[in-house]
Every structure is written in structure tokens, then in C-alpha cells.
UniProtKB/Swiss-Prot annotation:
[4Fe-4S] cluster 1 binds at residues 22, 58, 92. NCBIfam families: miaB-methiolase, MiaB/RimO family radical SAM methylthiotransferase. This is tRNA-2-methylthio-N(6)-dimethylallyladenosine synthase. It comes from Paracoccus denitrificans (strain Pd 1222). Its cofactor is [4Fe-4S] cluster. The lineage of its organism: Bacteria, Pseudomonadati, Pseudomonadota, Alphaproteobacteria, Rhodobacterales.
Length: 445
């Protein structure tokens, strides 16, 4: 027997990843897991038996850094018990904080920004390091091809990263860098690979996803709408979604894709942030309320059944009650299916950081008023689905025997009694009941 044959197989190394924040972080965590898989790591859901713990952070929400340091504090006993445990911090807080993370928390071995995670395996082999550079090379070119394993029926696919808009409240241009669009060929290859592994729904991701542009196979310039049409041509793919968008990049070809492409779901998340022209200017949003409302009219004319969702920030520096009333008026005018609303929180390094904040109690009251209006609209939208027949893609079994849970065309969670169904089935469901955050129905005859 040769020495090679007699060597024991290397011990399996276990990787635990905690993902904070947006869908792109979910995608990034998956790609980092695949990169570390090439190093012999397998994912574990048990943090205590991991050989590496990776915290993939988000910097959008309030007190993101404090939440990270709190989680790291809870890892101190585990690191003391197992000094060989590698602890890494990835994502946008890693980009923003850099070496400060290791200074405050020496238990952290690795700090890697979102544009450098293709170098995570080399950093792990080195044992310790910080990499928050914006490399010239495309990180996707250096990541291993995903393993040919069966996938869940819905998947994310990053097509664009970074943002050039520089909204006054936002850290994304500083943590994710300038806008970069992935090449058409790479996107289509990854989409085909996902479909070959059982994916029926793809959500295209980007910080400013509808700003994507690239060169098509014939050498012409493509916009995001043309990319969607090309992805829709993939046999076996049934649904396409995308997030997150900027109103200024809702080009004619993208609106036309909503009109013409049946695989593009009738759902659009289009953040507006405020219903006051004065505040929109202070935020550097580069559009007016009227421009947003006219855009909504064009979108609804192209796709009358579309559900619109949005984001709002209340209590932005300088916001008056009149500005707040303008936001309420915009919400009433559009009638959103759902929306996310937050009280402004300052982000170091952003233009709005040094501006005087309004009184906290005033901002809290405005947020409550806005959320009450948005909740009433969401309730009406949910109730309006009762009696309708919707497409539902089953993603997992429900808690009850014979029950399946899936997503509707409009991204609702839908509960259905379907004992013979399986994950990945795309079925028609007649909606019979609505709840604040879900629907229930029966299989259509």
C-alpha cells in the first residue's frame, strides 16, 4: 500500500456564517461558503462546533457596528476555550471599520470587505489579516464555480454592485464602492447554472440594480431591461425579480419589460424616502415628488396589476411637519402594497452626519403616523387578494402535515394544504384568507 493511500482523509472543517441585512449579503455569504468549501470547509448551523465563525455584516440599519461588537463579545468565551477558532468579520461594517475591529476586539482574526471576499481563503490560510481594498480585478472571476448540487427553487444572483448616487444619508458608496456591472456572459452563465440545479425563480440583486448596463454578445450596449429579456429566454426559468432600484434608472426598456415579459413578476420595490421636494433635495435624491408620481403612472400603465413597495426615512435633518405631511400625501397618492419605514439615524462619513437632528420624540410620532397609514394600505392590499387566483412557488413544507409554504407572484408567503405537492412545484392557488403578513389558499381546480 502506498503512503498516499495510507494517509487518513483530512478532518472536515466546519464554517458557521451569520448573515445580517440585505439579500445581497445572503448572496455574498453563499459565495463565501462556496469559496471556503474549496478549502475543505462545510457549513454548520452550530456555532459552538465551528472551526471558523464568519459574521457578514450590514451597515444600513441603526447601530450596526454596536450590534457587531455585541455579537463579538459573546464569542469571547468560545475563543478562550478554543484558541484555534478563526473569527472573521465580513461585509459593510468590516469595510467601514477596518483595522478598528481588531483593535477593539483582538479575538477577530480576519476582516474582509465586500469587494475582497474572494481573497478570504488566502487570508484564512495566513491566519490573520485585514483586507478592505477595492481591487481592480473582478472578484467574481476569482471565485470557484458553485458545486453542482441541487438548489432551492428560488435563488439570488448579483448583477451589479456599488452606488454612485451618494444620497446624503447612505453609506453604500463608501462601503460597496462605485457602481460596477457584471458582464452579460457571466450573468447568463450563472443563471443557466442555477436553473440546471433546480432553480425556478431568480432575484437579480444590486445596490442600484436597475442601473446595470453592459455590452451584449453582438457588441451593442444593453440596459437592464434587455438583460431581463435575455435571462427570461432560459428554458426552465419561470420567474424573475429584482431589487433594489432607484427611480432615476427606471428606463423605458425596463418599463417595457414589465409590460411584455410574463416571467418578470408584477412586483417592484422603488424607494422614494420622502414626499417633500425640499427633503428630497437635502437627501440628494435627484428627483422630485412629481417626477416620482409620473413614473409610477407610467409603470402602472405598462403593468396595471403591479404591486409597488417602497422605503421611507422620517425625521431627516431639517424635516418640518409640512414635509412630513407631504410624505403622507405621497403614500395616499401611490397606495403601496407594503413599505419599509425608518427613523433617520446618522451615519459617520455621510454628508448628513453633521446636520442637526430633529427632536427624537417628534421623529417617533411621525414614524408612528406613517407606519399606521402604510399598515392600513398593506391590510387592504392583503384583503384584496382574497378570491384571486395566484401563482405560488412552493419553497418549503409548512408546520402542519400536508401543508406547503410558497411565494406568490407578489412575494406574499402563501400557506396551502397540498399533501401531494413537493418543494419546487409552481401551482395555481385560490386565495381564501389574508393575514397581516401572509395569505392562505387552496389549490385551484
Amino acid at each position: 500500500m502506498s503512503d498516499q493511500a495510507s494517509k487518513p482523509a483530512p478532518a472536515v472543517k466546519k464554517l458557521f456564517i451569520k448573515t445580517y441585512g440585505c439579500q445581497m449579503n445572503v448572496y455574498d455569504s453563499q459565495r463565501m461558503a462556496e469559496a471556503m468549501g474549496a478549502e475543505g470547509y462545510v457549513l454548520t448551523e452550530n456555532q459552538s462546533d465551528a472551526d471558523m465563525v464568519l459574521l457578514n455584516t450590514c451597515h444600513i440599519r441603526e447601530k450596526a457596528a454596536e450590534k457587531l461588537y455585541s455579537d463579538l463579545g459573546r464569542l469571547k468565551p468560545l475563543k478562550a476555550e478554543r484558541p484555534d477558532l478563526k473569527i472573521g468579520v465580513a461585509g459593510c461594517v468590516a469595510q467601514a471599520e477596518g483595522e478598528e475591529i481588531q483593535r477593539r476586539m483582538p479575538i477577530v482574526d480576519l476582516v474582509v470587505g465586500p469587494q475582497a471576499y474572494h481573497r478570504l481563503p488566502a487570508m484564512a490560510r495566513a491566519g490573520r489579516g485585514v483586507d478592505t481594498e477595492f481591487p481592480a480585478e473582478d472578484k467574481f472571476e476569482h471565485l470557484p464555480k458553485p458545486a453542482a448540487t441541487r438548489r432551492a427553487p428560488a435563488a439570488f444572483l448579483t448583477v451589479q454592485e456599488g452606488c454612485d448616487k451618494f444620497c446624503a444619508f447612505c453609506v453604500v458608496p463608501y462601503t460597496r464602492g462605485a457602481e460596477v456591472s457584471r458582464p452579460v456572459s457571466r450573468i447568463l452563465a450563472e443563471a443557466r447554472d442555477l436553473v440546471a440545479r433546480g432553480v425556478r425563480e431568480i432575484t437579480l440583486l444590486g445596490q442600484n440594480v436597475n442601473g446595470w448596463h453592459g455590452e451584449g454578445p453582438e457588441g451593442s450596449e444593453w440596459g437592464f431591461g434587455r438583460l431581463i429579456r435575455a435571462i427570461a429566454e432560459i428554458d426552465g426559468l419561470d420567474r424573475i425579480r429584482y431589487t433594489t432600484s432607484h427611480p432615476n434608472d427606471m428606463a423605458d426598456d425596463l418599463i417595457a419589460a414589465h409590460r411584455d415579459e410574463p416571467k418578470l413578476m408584477p412586483y417592484l420595490h422603488l424607494p422614494v424616502q420622502s414626499g417633500s421636494d425640499r427633503i428630497l433635495k437635502a437627501m440628494n435624491r435627484r428627483h422630485t415628488v412629481d417626477q416620482y408620481l409620473r413614473l409610477i403612472e407610467r409603470i402602472r400603465e405598462a403593468r396595471p396589476d403591479i404591486m409597488l413597495t417602497s422605503d421611507f426615512i422620517v425625521g431627516f435633518p431639517g424635516e418640518t411637519d409640512q414635509d412630513h405631511q407631504g410624505t403622507l400625501e405621497l403614500v395616499r397618492a401611490v397606495n403601496f402594497g407594503t413599505a419599509f419605514s425608518f427613523k433617520y439615524s446618522p451615519r459617520p462619513g455621510t454628508p448628513a452626519y453633521e446636520r442637526p437632528e430633529i427632536e427624537g420624540a417628534v421623529a417617533d410620532a411621525r414614524l408612528q403616523e406613517l407606519q399606521a397609514l402604510l399598515t392600513s394600505q398593506q391590510k387592504a392590499a392583503q384583503e384584496g387578494m382574497v378570491g384571486r387566483e395566484l401563482g405560488v412557488l412552493f419553497e418549503k413544507p409548512g408546520r402542519n402535515p400536508g401543508q406547503m409554504v410558497g411565494k406568490s407572484d407578489y412575494l406574499h408567503a402563501v400557506f396551502v394544504e397540498a399533501p401531494a405537492a413537493k418543494v419546487g412545484d409552481l401551482v395555481r392557488v385560490r386565495i381564501t384568507h389574508s393575514a397581516p403578513n401572509s395569505l392562505a389558499g387552496v389549490l385551484a381546480a
